[in-house]
Amino acid sequence: MKVNSKTLQSVKEDLLNIEQTLNKLIKVNNPILSAAAKHLLIVESKKIRPAIVLLVAKAIDKNKKIKTSQQRLAEVTEIIHTATLLHDDVVDESIIRRGTKSVNKTFGNKIAVFAGDFLFAQSSWYLANINNLEVVKAISKVITDLAEGELQQNLTQFNTYYSIIKYLEKSFNKTASLIAASCKSCCLLSDFDQSLNSKFYNYGKNLGLAFQIIDDILDITSSSTALGKMTTSDLKLGNLTAPVLFALTKNSKLFKIIEREFCEKSDISEAINIIKETNAIEESFDLAYEHIEAAINSIKDLPTSSEKDSLIEIAYDLLNRYK
């Protein structure tokens, strides 16, 4: 998830602190496991998920203060996200992540799985030490959602009767749940109006759904270099995303290509051409835009602040990834 660096200006120093802290938090005696666990954490990235948590913390505090527990929540969010990437790359046999070799490509599948498990365990430890039961419940549910989402995806590969509703349910579990719960948990850790919980939960939920839809568009339309990971990987695996599902309603030939599981050499390129020739990409973008609008509307009544503006800008930056 990429955003304009100016959008994160108000939490720039806080993010630098988090990057330094993350390296210290991941403690393990085995050097191979340590290197594998830190492989993606230390790769330069926007760290947008922890940035969102920090922006929420400042947006709801008139003194613009970030509590220690909120910073730790931001760190836990990034650790969980990284753990999911390690496991996803093993399942999807990915070789590139964040513009570098994936952990499974560098260290092998077993080490990648162990490293992902280790990061989940570390996140649970640090989460428990935040010492807030409601936050523990919210983030623990995320880990359940992540597993369920991955299973939903793998059990529906090449299923041409898969619906947009089911796709959004899966996308919530795999992507949006973590952002939604982190935003809500940041409010739970504040000393301010708890009625904001649902507003920020809905912001995170819709932002996460929009991100996944845009990411799925780019999997069809972008390059591996621009995206920082292999493109058309979901399509090849039979993971039917929004552009594919919309295209299926307009071209019966795509049904046949998918149902034979791309067994012919030209099937992938032909499927991509069909998707691009329909207005499936545009329909997918419109769906993402609906969720962006819903995210922004969730927080539009907040008091004016640079942090609120940044949260809104992050939403629009997602759309600019496609444009």
From Swiss-Prot:
CDD domains: Trans_IPPS_HT
GO terms of molecular function: metal ion binding; prenyltransferase activity
Keyword Chloroplast assigned: yes
Positions annotated to bind isopentenyl diphosphate: 46, 49, 81, 98
Free-text remark on how the cofactor is bound: Binds 2 Mg(2+) ions per subunit.
UniProt cofactor(s): Mg(2+)
A single Gene Ontology CC term: chloroplast
Residues reported to bind Mg(2+) 2: 88, 92
Keywords: Chloroplast, Isoprene biosynthesis, Magnesium, Metal-binding, Photosynthesis, Plastid, Transferase
Enzyme Commission number, as recorded: 2.5.1.-
Record-linked InterPro entries: Isoprenoid_synthase_dom_sf, Polyprenyl_synt, Polyprenyl_synt_CS
Keyword Chloroplast: yes
GO BP terms, alphabetized: isoprenoid biosynthetic process; photosynthesis; quinone biosynthetic process
Binding site for Mg(2+) 1: 88, 92
Subcellular localization, as worded in the UniProt entry: Plastid, Chloroplast
Amino acids binding an all-trans-polyprenyl diphosphate: 97, 174-175, 212
Family from the record: Belongs to the FPP/GGPP synthase family.
Function: Possible role in synthesis of the nonaprenyl side chain of plastoquinone or in synthesis of other prenyl chains such as undekaprenyl pyrophosphate.
NCBIfam families, per the entry: prenyl_cyano
Record protein name field: Prenyl transferase
Native source organism of the sequence: Cyanidium caldarium (Red alga)
